[in-house]
């Protein structure tokens, strides 16, 4: 697809968004739930990227006024993630939410977030994981990885 291709926003059903994330996301499975999803499609109507927005994963951030972009996934088409981060914030505000956050992992630049006007507000050190001898648990994919917390403008 050309760098000059025109992208537009499209509604995406939960199942379609989850399938897209399953195919294209680099390191996580689709999230368990969502409030809404939005997609970016090209001029031919081909879905090029999705954003899934839901309740914050961290309980202390789940205050009823905050949502979290829990996944974005793209087929590599330029500018799709910035488009989706901006659209997600506009949709969240229209639904009455006052805050939208997301996390990036160490090694991810955050260029799409900066392009959409988001602010880096905190850095989180790597977690040791949830496994304990009394309660064995499998890792969830982002243990031992530093993360950055971003907030919509």
Regions found by a protein language model. Name each.
Residues 2-3, 20-22, 51, 95, ...:
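Generic, low-specificity signal for short hydrophobic/alpha-helical stretches with a mild N-terminal bias
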Residues 8-11, 35, 41-42, 47, ...:
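Acyl-donor binding region in acyl/amide transferases
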Residues 1-31:
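Short amphipathic alpha-helix that is part of the acyltransferase structural core
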Residues 40-43, 151-153:
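Active-site beta-strand termini and strand-to-loop segments that position acidic
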Residues 143-148:
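Class I (Rossmann-like) S-adenosyl-L-methionine-dependent methyltransferase catalytic domain
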